Amino acid sequence: MPPRPQRLAPVADLPPVFAGIDEAGRGCLAGPVVAAAVILPQEYTLPGLTDSKKLTAARRESLAEGIRSCAVTWGLGVVWPRDIDRINILQATFRAMARAVRVLRQPPPALLIDGDKTLPPHVLTTLSCDGHLPTQRAIIGGDGCIPAISAASILAKTFRDRLMDTLDRRYHGYGFAKHKGYGTAEHLAAIAAHGPCAQHRLTFRGVRPNPAAEEQLTLW
Protein backbone atom coordinates (compact mmCIF):
# COMPACT_ATOMS: atom_id res chain seq x y z
CA MET A 1 0.00 0.00 0.00
CA PRO A 2 1.33 3.50 -0.80
CA PRO A 3 1.94 5.78 2.17
CA ARG A 4 -1.10 7.75 3.28
CA PRO A 5 -1.04 11.44 2.38
CA GLN A 6 -0.66 13.96 5.17
CA ARG A 7 -2.31 17.36 5.29
CA LEU A 8 0.53 18.90 7.24
CA ALA A 9 4.06 17.66 7.81
CA PRO A 10 5.77 19.11 10.89
CA VAL A 11 9.32 20.19 10.17
CA ALA A 12 10.63 17.61 12.64
CA ASP A 13 8.93 14.91 10.61
CA LEU A 14 10.64 15.77 7.33
CA PRO A 15 13.61 13.79 6.01
CA PRO A 16 16.91 15.71 6.22
CA VAL A 17 17.30 15.82 2.43
CA PHE A 18 14.44 15.57 -0.03
CA ALA A 19 13.12 16.88 -3.32
CA GLY A 20 9.85 18.78 -3.29
CA ILE A 21 7.72 18.00 -6.36
CA ASP A 22 4.70 19.69 -7.91
CA GLU A 23 3.09 20.15 -11.32
CA ALA A 24 1.37 22.79 -13.42
CA GLY A 25 -1.17 22.44 -16.21
CA ARG A 26 -2.79 19.18 -15.22
CA GLY A 27 -6.31 20.50 -15.71
CA CYS A 28 -5.70 22.48 -18.90
CA LEU A 29 -7.29 21.75 -22.25
CA ALA A 30 -4.14 22.64 -24.19
CA GLY A 31 -0.40 22.60 -23.76
CA PRO A 32 1.84 20.28 -21.78
CA VAL A 33 1.80 19.21 -18.17
CA VAL A 34 4.99 20.41 -16.48
CA ALA A 35 6.50 19.13 -13.23
CA ALA A 36 9.36 20.51 -11.19
CA ALA A 37 11.58 18.98 -8.51
CA VAL A 38 13.59 21.14 -6.10
CA ILE A 39 16.09 20.41 -3.35
CA LEU A 40 16.56 23.46 -1.14
CA PRO A 41 19.59 24.00 1.12
CA GLN A 42 19.25 23.93 4.88
CA GLU A 43 19.37 27.73 4.95
CA TYR A 44 18.05 30.07 2.28
CA THR A 45 16.34 33.43 1.90
CA LEU A 46 13.18 33.35 -0.20
CA PRO A 47 10.70 35.72 1.48
CA GLY A 48 7.11 35.16 0.43
CA LEU A 49 7.69 31.60 -0.78
CA THR A 50 4.30 29.87 -0.95
CA ASP A 51 1.92 28.08 -3.32
CA SER A 52 2.31 29.56 -6.81
CA LYS A 53 -1.46 30.00 -7.15
CA LYS A 54 -1.41 32.57 -4.34
CA LEU A 55 1.17 34.79 -6.06
CA THR A 56 1.01 37.33 -8.84
CA ALA A 57 2.79 36.53 -12.09
CA ALA A 58 5.45 39.13 -11.33
CA ARG A 59 6.07 37.74 -7.85
CA ARG A 60 6.30 34.19 -9.22
CA GLU A 61 8.94 35.25 -11.73
CA SER A 62 10.94 37.03 -9.05
CA LEU A 63 10.83 34.03 -6.74
CA ALA A 64 11.64 31.63 -9.58
CA GLU A 65 14.89 33.48 -10.20
CA GLY A 66 15.77 33.25 -6.51
CA ILE A 67 14.87 29.56 -6.36
CA ARG A 68 17.09 28.72 -9.33
CA SER A 69 19.94 30.65 -7.74
CA CYS A 70 19.79 29.18 -4.24
CA ALA A 71 18.54 25.62 -4.81
CA VAL A 72 20.96 22.76 -4.31
CA THR A 73 19.52 21.43 -7.56
CA TRP A 74 16.30 21.72 -9.51
CA GLY A 75 14.78 20.03 -12.54
CA LEU A 76 11.82 20.21 -14.90
CA GLY A 77 9.86 17.51 -16.72
CA VAL A 78 7.46 18.07 -19.61
CA VAL A 79 4.87 15.79 -21.23
CA TRP A 80 3.08 17.08 -24.33
CA PRO A 81 -0.57 16.66 -25.40
CA ARG A 82 0.02 13.75 -27.77
CA ASP A 83 1.37 11.64 -24.92
CA ILE A 84 -1.26 12.94 -22.50
CA ASP A 85 -3.95 11.67 -24.88
CA ARG A 86 -2.13 8.36 -25.29
CA ILE A 87 -1.46 7.47 -21.64
CA ASN A 88 -3.97 9.75 -19.79
CA ILE A 89 -3.30 12.83 -17.69
CA LEU A 90 -2.57 10.97 -14.45
CA GLN A 91 0.16 8.82 -16.00
CA ALA A 92 1.48 11.84 -17.90
CA THR A 93 1.79 13.76 -14.64
CA PHE A 94 3.69 10.88 -13.04
CA ARG A 95 5.98 10.77 -16.07
CA ALA A 96 6.66 14.52 -15.91
CA MET A 97 7.51 14.25 -12.22
CA ALA A 98 9.92 11.38 -12.84
CA ARG A 99 11.61 13.32 -15.63
CA ALA A 100 12.06 16.29 -13.31
CA VAL A 101 13.71 14.09 -10.69
CA ARG A 102 15.98 12.35 -13.20
CA VAL A 103 17.60 15.62 -14.31
CA LEU A 104 18.53 16.69 -10.77
CA ARG A 105 22.29 16.98 -10.31
CA GLN A 106 22.11 14.72 -7.27
CA PRO A 107 19.60 11.91 -6.73
CA PRO A 108 17.31 12.70 -3.80
CA PRO A 109 16.91 10.06 -1.08
CA ALA A 110 13.30 11.13 -0.56
CA LEU A 111 10.46 12.71 -2.55
CA LEU A 112 7.72 14.90 -1.08
CA ILE A 113 4.92 15.26 -3.63
CA ASP A 114 2.08 17.74 -3.53
CA GLY A 115 -1.33 16.09 -3.58
CA ASP A 116 -2.74 12.74 -2.57
CA LYS A 117 -0.79 10.36 -4.80
CA THR A 118 2.77 9.07 -4.88
CA LEU A 119 4.57 7.72 -7.94
CA PRO A 120 3.42 4.20 -8.85
CA PRO A 121 6.01 1.39 -8.80
CA HIS A 122 6.51 1.29 -12.57
CA VAL A 123 7.48 4.97 -12.51
CA LEU A 124 9.40 4.92 -9.22
CA THR A 125 11.72 2.16 -10.45
CA THR A 126 12.98 4.48 -13.20
CA LEU A 127 14.54 6.61 -10.44
CA SER A 128 16.74 3.84 -9.04
CA CYS A 129 20.25 4.99 -8.13
CA ASP A 130 22.77 2.21 -7.49
CA GLY A 131 19.87 -0.09 -6.74
CA HIS A 132 18.29 2.28 -4.22
CA LEU A 133 14.87 3.86 -4.67
CA PRO A 134 13.88 7.14 -3.03
CA THR A 135 11.25 7.05 -0.34
CA GLN A 136 8.18 9.13 -1.13
CA ARG A 137 5.29 10.80 0.60
CA ALA A 138 2.21 12.58 -0.75
CA ILE A 139 1.23 15.71 1.17
CA ILE A 140 -2.15 17.32 0.55
CA GLY A 141 -1.62 21.07 0.45
CA GLY A 142 2.12 20.59 0.44
CA ASP A 143 2.58 23.49 -1.94
CA GLY A 144 1.44 25.78 0.86
CA CYS A 145 3.32 24.28 3.80
CA ILE A 146 6.53 22.65 2.51
CA PRO A 147 8.93 25.26 1.06
CA ALA A 148 10.60 22.88 -1.40
CA ILE A 149 7.19 21.93 -2.81
CA SER A 150 6.22 25.61 -2.98
CA ALA A 151 9.43 26.21 -4.91
CA ALA A 152 8.61 23.36 -7.29
CA SER A 153 5.12 24.75 -7.87
CA ILE A 154 6.60 28.13 -8.80
CA LEU A 155 9.21 26.73 -11.18
CA ALA A 156 6.65 24.50 -12.90
CA LYS A 157 4.12 27.31 -13.24
CA THR A 158 6.52 29.97 -14.54
CA PHE A 159 8.15 27.61 -17.03
CA ARG A 160 4.80 26.42 -18.34
CA ASP A 161 3.45 29.96 -18.63
CA ARG A 162 6.42 30.90 -20.81
CA LEU A 163 5.82 27.84 -22.97
CA MET A 164 2.19 28.87 -23.45
CA ASP A 165 3.29 32.39 -24.42
CA THR A 166 5.50 30.84 -27.10
CA LEU A 167 2.69 28.58 -28.31
CA ASP A 168 0.40 31.60 -28.54
CA ARG A 169 2.70 33.10 -31.16
CA ARG A 170 2.66 29.85 -33.13
CA TYR A 171 -1.04 28.98 -32.88
CA HIS A 172 -3.01 32.14 -33.48
CA GLY A 173 -6.60 32.69 -32.46
CA TYR A 174 -6.75 30.60 -29.28
CA GLY A 175 -5.51 33.10 -26.69
CA PHE A 176 -2.97 30.76 -25.08
CA ALA A 177 -0.96 33.68 -23.66
CA LYS A 178 -4.03 34.90 -21.80
CA HIS A 179 -5.58 31.74 -20.36
CA LYS A 180 -2.53 29.42 -20.53
CA GLY A 181 -4.65 26.59 -21.91
CA TYR A 182 -7.31 26.49 -19.20
CA GLY A 183 -10.94 25.98 -20.16
CA THR A 184 -12.14 29.57 -20.04
CA ALA A 185 -15.20 30.71 -21.96
CA GLU A 186 -12.93 32.52 -24.40
CA HIS A 187 -10.87 29.38 -24.98
CA LEU A 188 -13.93 27.16 -25.47
CA ALA A 189 -15.34 29.67 -27.96
CA ALA A 190 -12.06 29.64 -29.90
CA ILE A 191 -12.10 25.84 -30.08
CA ALA A 192 -15.68 25.93 -31.33
CA ALA A 193 -14.76 28.51 -33.97
CA HIS A 194 -11.44 27.11 -35.19
CA GLY A 195 -11.41 23.50 -34.05
CA PRO A 196 -8.59 22.07 -31.93
CA CYS A 197 -4.94 22.59 -32.85
CA ALA A 198 -1.95 20.31 -32.35
CA GLN A 199 -1.54 21.55 -28.76
CA HIS A 200 -5.03 20.56 -27.63
CA ARG A 201 -5.74 17.46 -25.57
CA LEU A 202 -8.22 15.70 -27.79
CA THR A 203 -9.45 13.32 -25.08
CA PHE A 204 -10.57 16.16 -22.81
CA ARG A 205 -14.16 17.34 -22.57
CA GLY A 206 -14.51 20.66 -24.33
CA VAL A 207 -11.88 19.70 -26.93
CA ARG A 208 -12.78 16.30 -28.30
CA PRO A 209 -14.41 16.56 -31.74
CA ASN A 210 -17.11 14.01 -30.89
CA PRO A 211 -18.89 14.76 -27.59
CA ALA A 212 -20.09 11.15 -27.45
CA ALA A 213 -16.51 9.85 -27.52
CA GLU A 214 -14.99 8.38 -24.40
CA GLU A 215 -14.24 11.17 -21.95
CA GLN A 216 -10.98 11.54 -20.11
CA LEU A 217 -11.45 13.41 -16.87
CA THR A 218 -8.72 14.77 -14.63
CA LEU A 219 -7.93 11.93 -12.26
CA TRP A 220 -6.42 14.00 -9.54
UniProtKB/Swiss-Prot annotation:
Cellular location(s): Cytoplasm
Cofactor mode of binding and number, as noted: Manganese or magnesium. Binds 1 divalent metal ion per monomer in the absence of substrate. May bind a second metal ion after substrate binding.
Top EC group: hydrolase
GO cellular component terms listed in the entry, alphabetical order: cytoplasm; ribonuclease H2 complex
GO molecular function: manganese ion binding; RNA binding; RNA-DNA hybrid ribonuclease activity
GO biological process: DNA replication, removal of RNA primer; mismatch repair
Keyword Ribosomal protein assigned: no
Keyword Ion transport applies: no
Main location as per UniProt: cytoplasm
InterPro entries: RNase_HII (IPR022898), RNase_HII/HIII (IPR001352), RNase_HII/HIII_dom (IPR024567), RNaseH-like_sf (IPR012337), RNaseH_sf (IPR036397)
EC code(s) of this entry: 3.1.26.4
Cofactor: Mn(2+); Mg(2+)
Catalytic activity reported: Endonucleolytic cleavage to 5'-phosphomonoester
Binding locations of a divalent metal cation: D22, E23, D114
Keywords: Cytoplasm, Endonuclease, Hydrolase, Manganese, Metal-binding, Nuclease
Residue ranges constituting the RNase H type-2 domain according to the UniProt record: 16-216
Similarity comment: Belongs to the RNase HII family.
Function: Endonuclease that specifically degrades the RNA of RNA-DNA hybrids.
Name of the protein: Ribonuclease HII
